[in-house]
């Protein structure tokens, strides 16, 4: 699988299994931050779904969450799309963290949904706020054209160090991309 984006042909996988403990008391285990309306009339999860629809048809958007949050995910998606199929919500048996959750979801896509293993998938966290959504969409579309057989990641310039984040060491500048 290549993790990238191609307008209306790729798959989107939205990670929404977090426990929400860092924003307590607003967010909590049974209602993590991805389900909160923090910036507008939509939750972070709903905003991610709407953003994914700009690059992916709805039937190719999948969610991975834990059993405790299945109904939170399903109910919030139903608010936006009454026809959303709950088969597009993959349930982790235990909280797996990012890499194992992505692996489980890709396995589900290939083995259960019968997605071609050569398909392109973009992996999106459900709890991020994207200020300039048009720029973000265009970045993903441009990345798809240039990704080749590589795995890509999108990052921002950090303002200060933080032990909870990973960091990207940029290589040689290639227009808007780096090796």
Roles of regions detected by a PLM:
Residues 7, 11-14, 25, 37-120, ...:
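Conserved N-terminal catalytic core of the sugar/cofactor nucleotidyltransferase
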Residues 23, 35, 45, 168, ...:
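Short clusters of hydrophobic/aromatic residues that line enzyme substrate/ligand-binding pockets
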Residues 25-32:
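Gly-rich Lys/Arg/Thr-decorated short loops/hinges at beta-loop-alpha junctions or inter-strand turns
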Residues 126:
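Short acidic donor-binding/metal-coordinating loop in glycosyltransferase active sites
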Residues 131-179:
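Conserved core of the sugar-phosphate nucleotidyltransferase
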């Amino acid at each position: 699988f290549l993790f990238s984006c191609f307008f209306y042909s790729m798959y989107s996988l939205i990670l929404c299994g977090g426990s929400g403990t860092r924003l307590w008391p607003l967010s909590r285990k049974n209602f993590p931050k991805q389900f909160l309306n923090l910036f507008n009339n939509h939750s972070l999860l709903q905003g991610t779904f709407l953003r994914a629809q700009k690059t992916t048809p709805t039937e190719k958007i999948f969610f991975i969450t834990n059993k405790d949050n299945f109904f939170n995910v399903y109910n919030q998606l139903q608010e936006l799309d009454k026809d959303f199929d709950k088969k597009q919500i993959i349930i982790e048996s235990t909280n797996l963290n990012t890499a194992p959750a992505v692996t489980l979801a890709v396995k589900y896509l290939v083995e259960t949904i019968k997605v071609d293993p050569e398909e392109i998938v973009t992996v999106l966290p459900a709890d991020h706020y994207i200020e300039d959504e048009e720029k973000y969409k265009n970045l993903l579309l441009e990345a798809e054209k240039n990704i080749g057989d590589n795995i890509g990641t999108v990052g921002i310039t950090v303002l200060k160090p933080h032990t909870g984040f990973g960091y990207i060491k940029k290589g040689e500048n290639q227009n808007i991309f780096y090796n």
